[in-house]
Amino acid sequence: MNYLVMISFALLLVIGVESVRDGYFVEPDNCLVYCMPSPEICDRGCKRYGATSGFCKEFSKGENFCWCKGLR
């Protein structure tokens, strides 16, 4: 059991615990941001909030919203 704890701790040190999130970004009133009229809106908006990139993703039938990769 001691070895399991030591190995787990060593993995955390090697891998690191810093992580990023993916998800939809919202306007200040908590509304999802539509991709239309231009998908470039997503990339610019996501990068403004610290993401690595953004693109259109289908949320539900026929509705596309901005999806951000690597949000901090």
Curated annotation (Swiss-Prot):
PROSITE patterns: LCN_CSAB
Domain (LCN-type CS-alpha/beta): residue spans on this chain: 21-72
Species name: Androctonus australis (Sahara scorpion)
Lineage, opening ranks: Eukaryota, Metazoa, Ecdysozoa, Arthropoda, Chelicerata
InterPro entries: LCN-type_CS_alpha_beta_dom, Scorpion_toxin-like, Scorpion_toxin-like_sf, Scorpion_toxinL/defensin
GO cellular component: extracellular region
Keyword Disulfide bond tagged: yes
Molecular function (Gene Ontology), one example: sodium channel inhibitor activity
Tissue localization of expression: Expressed by the venom gland.
Superkingdom of this protein's organism: Eukaryota
Keyword flag Zinc: no
Name of the protein this chain belongs to: Probable neurotoxin pcD-996
Major localization class: secreted
